[in-house]
Amino acid sequence: MSASVRGNSKNPQSTSAITTLTDKLLEDISGDFETLQKQFSEKLETMSTRLDQLEESMREAMNKKSSVSPVTSTE
């Protein structure tokens, strides 16, 4: 390792800048993750609602079909 690189690792300003940058990046990533998590949860809720509606429609169609009496031919 060169002397200049070793010197930078002991430089408080350099360390502080790296720490600040790292903290900022972690905050950004955390914010992005929270946004994605919220969007994902909203999409799951929407899908769940749509599936519930589909199940209800199918249930109604099955009940309607079973309540219709069969037509008998008189010929």
Curated annotation (Swiss-Prot):
GO biological process: cellular heat acclimation
Pfam family, one: HSBP1
Record GO terms (molecular function): transcription corepressor activity
GO cellular component: cytosol; nucleus
Annotated family: Belongs to the HSBP1 family.
Entry protein name: Uncharacterized protein C16E9.15
Species of provenance: Schizosaccharomyces pombe (strain 972 / ATCC 24843)
Lineage, opening ranks: Eukaryota, Fungi, Dikarya, Ascomycota, Taphrinomycotina
